[in-house]
């Protein structure tokens, strides 16, 4: 070792010793999440498990996470997992972190697979990338290569959770999330990967299926106009509303009915309008879903002033289709009470 390297290691070891208590807490808490990891799944998909991969609990990297390879031959590969803190200032981890751990572990498998076949999908990737470039930039994926690497890794991450369901999120939800981020061909990708799942007698591992994945990418690029149309049609929108927004509330009507273009997930979120002059129509009645398409808000006319305008907005994030695609934007709604 060089003097500089020895000094770096000395400083590192001293820092670790000084903060050993915090690292012990981090290790214990992170292990409560890692215990749910299905290592056998990695072996079944790639022919090799993650046993030789180390997980580093980083307290100096903020919430950032990344995968790394050993610098010299024989050094182990691994992933670095950042953390947040609890109210006592100790390392804290969300139960949703398992998605990040799986994602980072998979980079050690998916990156080499894609690199081996990159020359066969390069041209197709150049067709896809301009359509999603702006959204990818928001995710810090600034090139065609990084975009396709993350698409493939996200695809396998979703497949993991399809095979290993976890409370709080599903493969359907993760697919919609990635589509909304900009990987707008992810639902097609998941549909295509069913061919792999249904023909494991022919394809022992993902490596065996890579020629078919290459064909899928090339076909997707050639059909991307339809991919764009499909994505634009996935987001639910309002097809009917009564009474019509910005109208006078008819006498005898005490329920606002809002119908959507797709069967909905069943959640809702209602917020006041940004215009402080317009009050929400406060009511003791709970909104409800009349059916999978129709959302109802019951008004209490006795609490509403004559001639006054009321309003609210439907929060797009809560009004999701059954496939968990949210509305494209918030929907503002107002009505005016009759003067008499």
Residue positions per predicted region:
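Acidic, low-complexity Ser/Thr/Gly/Pro-rich repeat segments typical of extracellular/periplasmic
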Residues: 230-340
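Single conserved hydrophobic/aromatic residue that forms the stacking wall/gate
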Residues: 1-7, 11
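Active-site recognition of the HExxH zinc-binding catalytic motif
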Residues: 95-116
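Pan-zinc metallopeptidase signature
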Residues: 157-239
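Active-site scaffold of zinc-dependent metalloenzymes
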Residues: 65-95
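Auxiliary, metal-adjacent structural segments of Zn-dependent hydrolase domains
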Residues: 19-75, 268, 273
């Amino acid at each position: 070792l060089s003097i500089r390297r020895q000094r770096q290691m000395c400083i590192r070891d001293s820092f670790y010793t000084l903060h050993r208590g915090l690292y012990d807490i981090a290790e214990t808490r992170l292990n409560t999440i890692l215990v749910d990891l299905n290592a056998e799944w990695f072996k079944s998909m790639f022919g090799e498990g993650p046993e030789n991969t180390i997980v580093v609990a980083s307290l100096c990297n903020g919430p950032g996470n990344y995968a790394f390879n050993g610098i010299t031959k024989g050094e182990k590969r691994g992933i670095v997992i950042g953390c947040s803190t609890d109210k006592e200032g100790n390392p804290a981890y969300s139960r949703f972190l398992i998605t990040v751990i799986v994602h980072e572990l998979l980079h050690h498998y998916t990156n080499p697979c894609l690199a081996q076949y990159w020359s066969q999908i390069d041209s197709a990737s150049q067709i896809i990338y301009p359509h999603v470039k702006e959204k990818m930039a928001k995710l810090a994926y600034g090139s065609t290569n990084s975009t396709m690497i993350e698409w493939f890794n996200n695809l396998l991450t979703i497949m993991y959770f399809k095979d290993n369901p976890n409370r709080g999120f599903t493969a359907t939800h993760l697919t919609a999330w990635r589509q909304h981020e900009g990987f707008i061909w992810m639902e097609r990708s998941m549909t295509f990967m069913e061919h792999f799942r249904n023909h494991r007698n022919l394809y022992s591992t993902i490596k065996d299926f890579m020629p078919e994945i290459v064909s899928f990418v090339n076909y997707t690029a050639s059909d991307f106009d339809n991919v764009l149309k499909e994505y634009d049609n996935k987001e639910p929108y309002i097809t009917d509303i009564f009474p019509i927004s910005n109208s006078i509330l008819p006498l005898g009507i005490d329920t606002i009915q809002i119908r959507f273009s797709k069967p909905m997930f069943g959640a809702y979120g209602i917020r006041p309008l940004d215009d402080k002059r317009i009050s929400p129509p406060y009511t003791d009645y709970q909104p409800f879903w009349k059916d999978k398409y129709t959302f109802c808000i019951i008004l209490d006319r006795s609490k509403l002033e004559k001639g006054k305008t009321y309003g609210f907005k439907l929060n797009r994030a809560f009004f999701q289709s059954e496939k968990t695609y949210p509305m494209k934007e918030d929907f503002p709604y107002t009505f005016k009470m009759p003067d008499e």
